[in-house]
C-alpha cells in the first residue's frame, strides 16, 4: 500500500495447553484454526473502515515468499516486528514476540492503513536472554544472534509421511521459555 501511514497489529491468545500434549496434533490444529480467524478479523476490519472512507489492506497471517537475498521466508511486512513497533510486546531470543499478557503464546494479525493513528508506547524488553531456548533447540537454529530460519523450519514443519498430513513437530523454544505465559501470568 504505497500511501500506508499506519500498521495495525493485533494478537490472539494461543492455548498454552497445546504445549503440554505428547501429540503434535493439537498444536498444529490450533495454529491451522487461528490463521484463518486472524485473516477474517483483518478483512472484516478493512471492510468496516471503508464505510468511513479509510482504505486498509489486510496482511495475510501466514503467507510468505522466499527471499533469495536473505535466504529467509518473508511476508509483505514482518508481523512480529510490526507488533513490537506497535507496542504489543518485544521479540525474545527465540525470535518470537513476547507480550506481557500472553507471553509467546500469541498469534499475530496485521492491517496496513492509509489513515495515520497515534502509536502505542513501545514495551520494555521482557526476554533476559537466559538462553534456555538456545540450549533446547534440537538443530541449533538459535546459536547465532539471528534465528537460522530454514534450519528451524526444516526440522519443525513438515509432512508426517506415515499419516500423510502436515504437522508442526517442534516448538521446544516456546515450551522452555520462562515467559511463555507472559510477565503478568509468570509462574516461578
Segments from the language model and where they lie:
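Non-catalytic, usually N-terminal nucleic-acid engagement modules in DNA/RNA processing proteins
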Residues: 1-31, 35-36
Amino acid at each position: 500500500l504505497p500511501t500506508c501511514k499506519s500498521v495495525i497489529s493485533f494478537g490472539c491468545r494461543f492455548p498454552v495447553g497445546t504445549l503440554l500434549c505428547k501429540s503434535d496434533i493439537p498444536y498444529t490444529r490450533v495454529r491451522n484454526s487461528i490463521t484463518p480467524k486472524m485473516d477474517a478479523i483483518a478483512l472484516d476490519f478493512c471492510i468496516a473502515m471503508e464505510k468511513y472512507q479509510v482504505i486498509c489492506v489486510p496482511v495475510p497471517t501466514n503467507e510468505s515468499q522466499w527471499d533469495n537475498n536473505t535466504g529467509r521466508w518473508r511476508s509483505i511486512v514482518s508481523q512480529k516486528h510490526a507488533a513490537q513497533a506497535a507496542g504489543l510486546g518485544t521479540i525474545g531470543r527465540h525470535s518470537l514476540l513476547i507480550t506481557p499478557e500472553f507471553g509467546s503464546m500469541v498469534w499475530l494479525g496485521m492491517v496496513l492503513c492509509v489513515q495515520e493513528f497515534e502509536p502505542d508506547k513501545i514495551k520494555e524488553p521482557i526476554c533476559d536472554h537466559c538462553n534456555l531456548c538456545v540450549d533446547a533447540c534440537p538443530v541449533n537454529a538459535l546459536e547465532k544472534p539471528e534465528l537460522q530460519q530454514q534450519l528451524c523450519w526444516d526440522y519443525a514443519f513438515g509432512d508426517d509421511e506415515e499419516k500423510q498430513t502436515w504437522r508442526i513437530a517442534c516448538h521446544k523454544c516456546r515450551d522452555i521459555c520462562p515467559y511463555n505465559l507472559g510477565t503478568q501470568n509468570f509462574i516461578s
